[in-house]
Every structure is written in C-alpha cells, then in structure tokens.
A protein has these predicted regions:
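Conserved C-terminal helix/tail region of periplasmic/extracytoplasmic solute-binding proteins
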Residues: 286-308
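Pocket-lining segment of extracytoplasmic ligand-binding domains
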Residues: 82, 153-249
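Secondary-structure end/capping motifs
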Residues: 216-293
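Second-shell loop/turn segments in exported
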Residues: 25, 125-130, 173, 213, ...
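Short, glycine-/small- and polar/acidic-enriched structural segments
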Residues: 21-150, 156-158, 174-178, 194, ...
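Extracytoplasmic/secreted envelope proteins and their assembly/folding machinery
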Residues: 42, 66, 70, 81-84, ...
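N-terminal signal peptide c-region/cleavage motif recognized by signal peptidases
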Residues: 14-16
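Bacterial N-terminal signal peptides that target proteins for export
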Residues: 1-6
Length: 308
C-alpha cells in the first residue's frame, strides 16, 4: 500500500514538473525583432524548452501584435515602447518581462531625399505618416516637443509601415516616421533622408511582453525564455556577418539594409526590467497622457512581471 501511495506521489510530482513547461509557445515577432528571428532560425527555443511546440507568427507592427495577445492567440511578443502603454490604457492584461535597451538609432523621421525640409521644426503644417500606437508615435511626439512644436501643429496620418512607405514614395506625405528595417531600407535605396532619430530623447528600448494568463500558468518558463533571447542577441553580436546574411535571406531584405540596421542597434543585453526602464517608460506614458494621446493614466510598474 505504501509503495502504491509513493508511486502516486511521484506521478503527481512528475506531472507538476511537466506542467512547468507549456505544451505550446506562440511567439509574435516583427521584421525588427532580430533576436527572435535568430532564435527561430537557430531553433533556440526548441532547445531551451524541449517539451514545447513553438509556433511563430509575424506582425507588421506592435499594435496588431497586442491585439493578438489580447485575443488569446499569442503568448509572448516583441514590441516597441508605446504599444504596451496603449494596451494598459485600453485595459489589456499583459506583462513586461524583458527589455532590449537601445540608443535611439533604430527609428527616424524621414523626408524625401530632394525635400526642402531641413529640420523637424519645418514640418509645421505638413503631413506626416506613422503607425498609431507604435514606437514611431513616441519618437515623433518627442521630436516635435524638442523642436518647440505641439502635436496639433502637424497633420499626422496614421498608416502601417507598408502603406506609409507607399504614401511617402508617392508624395502623399511630407515625412515618414518609422523604425528599422523599414527606416534603413528607405535610406539604402536612396529614396529618403534622415531628418532626425531618437538619440537624446531617452528611448526606453523595445520590450518583450507576455499575456498575463500565460505568465500566471508558466512563470518558471519566463526565465528560460529570457535566457534564450539573450543567447540569440549574443549571436548577432558575436557572429554579425553570418547573422546579417541569415536575416537578409529569411526576411527577404538586402544585406546592406540588414547591415545598416545592425549598425543602429545597441550592444546592451536583453534582460529583465530594472527601475530605470520602468521609470523611462512611466515618463513616456505620462507624456502621452498629458498630450491627450491616451485616455487615462497608466501605472507601468503594475504590468511588470514578477519572477517567482
């Protein structure tokens, strides 16, 4: 009887251990998600979570990725600084679990190469394309304020990266605010000139977020996920030529475009959020509320994953 009881206990414990890893991990990424793309191509998540089936879903930007996360069709994703702020303001239940710091070089305000506009201040009254609720939204707001302008001083047209590129090339907008690799692609092909980037504007970086139900059910897996992302990032730093070639082939981009993007990236490691990250993100959220761009104040700290 004792042996039967012991076997039952061992079976239960084994079941709990197995439950610590999800049966499926659904990952949302963008063309800008270097670490995720490399992790996918090198099957790093499959190695880190051997009992887990990994599914990859590509998105054109952070806002649609957030929608998928909220709709229950995604577990984790990589986004810029503004999508999670908009998500919190909309009552979406997600958690920040890691950050990839940047230096503000991976996104820019672009104008046509032949444009007479030489400064952000000269965009007053002009039409500017960007994706609403994206990191480009933040870059442009801060760029305007630095130039002494207000949001109302320009005519912002909300467009996806692909539609923004088309409008930009057709002369339907005077400027386009976008992130890499779209930014590098427009500059490399000679159609765009950089009016300004995010340097000096205290960018918070890009974030890795998880749906709260997943975080609550599999908190032990988050550490392994962060380590895997950090490993993928190290590959991009330690093997840049190989990583550039792989990214170019995988995403269908010119190697010169990916090389430019890599040159804009920060070597800072992917890691759990620290007080400085939360503080930067909170100041950005407060700025968006003060400018009427989100409907209510948000508390960033409330959405930060707490490791068990």
């Amino acid at each position: 009887m004792l042996k039967i009881f012991a076997a039952a206990v061992l079976s239960l414990v084994a079941g709990l251990v197995l439950a610590a890893e999800p049966a499926t991990l659904r990952i949302g990424y963008q063309k800008s998600s270097v670490s995720m793309v490399l992790a996918r191509e090198h099957k790093l998540f499959e190695d880190a979570l051997p009992g887990t089936q990994v599914q990859w879903i590509e998105f054109l930007g952070g806002p649609p990725l957030i929608e998928a996360l909220n709709g229950g069709s995604l577990d984790i994703g990589n986004i810029g600084d503004i999508p999670p702020i908009f998500a919190q303001a909309a009552g979406i239940d997600l958690q920040y679990f890691a950050v990839e710091p940047n230096e503000g070089k991976t996104e820019a305000v672009l104008v046509p190469k032949a444009s007479s506009v030489q400064s952000v201040a000269e965009l007053k009254g002009k039409r500017v394309a960007l994706l609403k609720g994206s990191s480009a939204h933040n870059l442009f707001l801060k760029s305007l304020l630095r130039a002494g302008l207000q949001w109302k001083d320009v005519n912002v047209v909300y467009l996806s990266p692909s539609d923004g590129r088309a409008a930009f090339e057709q002369g339907k907008v005077d400027a386009w605010v976008v992130w890499d690799p779209y930014y590098s692609a427009a500059v490399v092909d000679g159609s765009a000139r950089v009016l300004g980037d995010g340097q000096g504007l205290n960018p918070a970086g890009s974030f890795f977020v998880v749906s709260s139900p997943f975080a609550k059910q599999y908190p032990q897996s988050i550490g392994a996920i962060i380590k895997t992302l950090a490993k993928a990032q190290r590959l991009s730093l330690d093997q840049p030529k190989e990583s550039i070639a792989l990214m170019a082939k995988t995403l269908g981009l010119q190697p010169a475009v990916v090389k430019s993007y890599f040159e804009h990236r920060s070597p800072a490691p992917i890691r759990p959020l620290e007080a400085v990250d939360v503080g930067n993100q909170q100041r950005t959220a407060d700025l968006f509320f003060a400018n009427g761009l989100i409907p209510k104040k948000v508390d960033v700290q409330q959405a930060v994953f707490k490791a068990p």
